[in-house]
């Protein structure tokens, strides 16, 4: 097909602003699916995506649209994940397009994630078409939404398209705007092959399926291709386009988007953002912007039932087939048995993986408190990276500790600013910027330690702003912090699963909160059980679970005091001996409760 009739575009929207519904309408209008095949949110194939109303993986769909000028155009919609954990995937999806629809909810206006992705699109030089959705709602305010697009994003919104994706009103105008405003792709089918991978998934029959946008050149069935980053070579076995059903074709040329199957065994071989080229006639340079995805948040995952350990390993291996950004390694804990130390892109990513393990593989799991990776310079000037409290070096060997930080953009209404400022101060944030986007909407930019965000920041932000704040963040390097390892000891023995890394200034409060919570949860024994919080050898907080005792004086009616004293002394001796040899079983609830302590302390 002539490249001047191809249009590649993405949809940028905040969660719940109607991106997947709009995609459904576009598919319906262009006749890509029959009425029988339509179901809500066609592109969100995972149950979890439908339920949470989020898009996790990027998809692409080819639609043929006969415009009002009687020309048939090929429109490639490249679906993007909208959540902050997957922002790198979004940036690669946007790099595959020439245009983007910026969808804003008429009743809610611009939110933080929309902003972050809109900036990405502007930086990629995309033609942006503002669309105001949900105008059928009684609370819709189109003028305010336009004002916010102009104030926050800096786009001219006077020609913004008012639509309702639910009823289909105004959706045809979007297709016409895409045809007339989005530029056709550049590129020459005769140049050496250069294609951008923007998604991949694992198919149990065909191996890895790659979604790619061909920037230069042509790829055909039977070609030998090479991945630029690792120089691995593969033979193209089949290729095609999604309409959203897969349709096989013989070749893809510059400007087109499609899938390639090339007998690739694992997703780990295929980096999102990598460049595909021919082995015989390679391109001169890779496409810009490729980076290896690194896990940011770490947690231990254990099964409640120790016998399910092998099932957990199999489940993790299957998930890893489809998700190269997720990593795991075996670890064992005295308290919880065998499990895995897992790395995730962020909190949502962690929740999704945990939920998929429980739902698809029917496992009962315990997750330890999430933490981040610290860079520690030791006294002998060597540098190590630690993401697990059990590997934390002795404090006498540490020269300095650096923790990862993020830049957070928070959009909210001005009446909630006070509560939010208090929250970010408490989380050790440093203010970078404070500006009014419109009359009453404020954008705060803060630098915060990632460690403070992983526990409960998002939930608390929602509660102090009554749900009116939205958050977007990206990594911003590291800063030096006095972090310490907080150990919890029960009956004099350290419980490894409860150790956490905390900032020195908060260690005392966190220790107090943990031991008092543990005291409520550990059942009374026949001897007293001390519960202590310690930093190194220094005990900073202590609670005691009192012993249960039998009334040994019950059978003494009156009688001499020395007789009573003798019985009490004898009981005391017995308790002492039990305390020396007694073992305390810590119930499962204690671990789960401790993970929740961070939410209130």
From Swiss-Prot:
Primary location class: membrane
GO molecular function, one term: GTPase activity
EC number: 3.6.5.n1
Membrane topology of the entry: Peripheral membrane protein
Residue span(s) of domain tr-type G: 4-186
One Gene Ontology term from the biological process aspect of the record: positive regulation of translation
Domain of life according to the entry: Bacteria
Keywords, alphabetical: Cell inner membrane, Cell membrane, GTP-binding, Hydrolase, Membrane, Nucleotide-binding, Protein biosynthesis
HAMAP family referenced in this protein's UniProt entry, alphabetically: LepA
Sequence similarity: Belongs to the TRAFAC class translation factor GTPase superfamily. Classic translation factor GTPase family. LepA subfamily.
Its job: Required for accurate and efficient protein synthesis under certain stress conditions. May act as a fidelity factor of the translation reaction, by catalyzing a one-codon backward translocation of tRNAs on improperly translocated ribosomes. Back-translocation proceeds from a post-translocation (POST) complex to a pre-translocation (PRE) complex, thus giving elongation factor G a second chance to translocate the tRNAs correctly. Binds to ribosomes in a GTP-dependent manner.
Protein name (database record): Elongation factor 4
Organism expressing this protein natively: Koribacter versatilis (strain Ellin345)
Gene: lepA
């Amino acid at each position: 097909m002539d490249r001047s009739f191809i249009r590649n575009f993405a949809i940028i929207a905040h969660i719940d602003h109607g991106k997947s519904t709009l995609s459904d309408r576009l598919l319906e209008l262009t006749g890509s699916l029959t009425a029988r095949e339509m179901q809500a949110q066609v592109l969100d194939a995972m149950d979890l995506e439908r339920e949470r109303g989020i898009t996790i993986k990027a998809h692409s769909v080819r639609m043929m649209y006969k415009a009002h000028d009687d020309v048939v155009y090929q429109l490639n919609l490249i679906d993007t994940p909208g959540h902050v954990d997957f922002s790198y995937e979004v940036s690669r999806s946007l790099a595959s397009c020439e245009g983007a629809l910026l969808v804003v909810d008429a009743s809610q206006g611009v939110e933080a994630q929309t902003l972050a992705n809109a900036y990405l699109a502007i930086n990629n030089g995309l033609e942006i078409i503002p669309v105001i959705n949900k105008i059928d709602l009684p609370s819709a305010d189109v003028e305010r939404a336009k004002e916010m697009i102009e104030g926050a994003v800096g786009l001219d919104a006077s020609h913004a398209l008012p639509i309702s994706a639910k009823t289909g009103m105004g959706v045809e105008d979007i297709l016409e705007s895409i045809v007339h405003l989005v530029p056709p792709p550049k590129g020459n089918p005769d140049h050496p092959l250069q294609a951008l991978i923007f998604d991949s998934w694992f198919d149990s029959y065909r191996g890895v399926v790659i979604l790619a946008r061909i920037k230069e050149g042509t790829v055909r069935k039977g070609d030998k291709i090479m991945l630029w980053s690792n120089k691995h070579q593969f033979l193209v076995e089949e290729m095609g386009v999604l309409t959203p059903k897969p349709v096989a074709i013989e070749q893809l040329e510059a400007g087109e988007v499609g899938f390639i199957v090339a007998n690739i065994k694992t997703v780990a071989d295929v980096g999102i953002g990598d460049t595909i080229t021919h082995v015989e006639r390679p391109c001169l340079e890779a496409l810009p912007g490729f980076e290896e995805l690194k896990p940011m948040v770490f947690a231990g995952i254990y099964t409640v039932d120790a016998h399910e350990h092998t099932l957990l390993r199999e489940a993790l291996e299957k998930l890893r087939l489809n998700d190269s950004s997720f990593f795991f390694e075996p670890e064992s804990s005295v308290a919880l048995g065998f499990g895995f130390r897992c790395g995730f892109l962020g909190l949502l990513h962690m929740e999704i993986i945990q939920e998929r393990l429980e739902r698809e593989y029917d496992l009962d799991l315990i997750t330890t408190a999430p933490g981040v990776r610290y860079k520690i310079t030791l006294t002998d000037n060597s540098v190590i990276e630690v993401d697990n409290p059990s590997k934390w070096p002795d404090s006498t060997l540490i020269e300095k500790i650096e923790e990862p930080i993020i830049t957070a953009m928070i959009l909210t209404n001005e009446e909630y600013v006070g509560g939010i400022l208090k929250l970010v101060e408490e989380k050790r944030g440093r203010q970078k910027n404070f500006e009014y986007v419109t009359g009453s909407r404020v954008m705060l930019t803060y630098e915060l330690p990632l460690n403070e965000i992983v526990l409960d920041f998002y939930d608390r932000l929602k509660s102090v702003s009554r749900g009116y704040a939205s958050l977007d963040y990206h990594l911003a390097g590291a800063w030096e912090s006095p972090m310490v390892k907080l150990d919890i000891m029960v009956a004099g023995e350290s419980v490894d699963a409860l150790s956490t890394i905390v900032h020195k200034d908060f260690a005392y409060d966190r220790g107090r909160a943990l031991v008092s919570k543990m005291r409520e949860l550990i059942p009374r024994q026949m001897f007293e059980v001390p519960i202590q919080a310690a930093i190194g050898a220094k005990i900073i907080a202590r609670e005691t679970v009192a012993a249960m005792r039998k009334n040994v004086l019950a059978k003494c009616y009156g009688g001499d005091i020395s007789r009573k004293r003798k019985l009490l002394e004898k009981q005391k001796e017995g308790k002492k001996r039990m305390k020396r040899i007694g073992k305390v079983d810590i119930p499962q609830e204690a671990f789960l409760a401790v993970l929740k302590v961070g939410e209130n302390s």
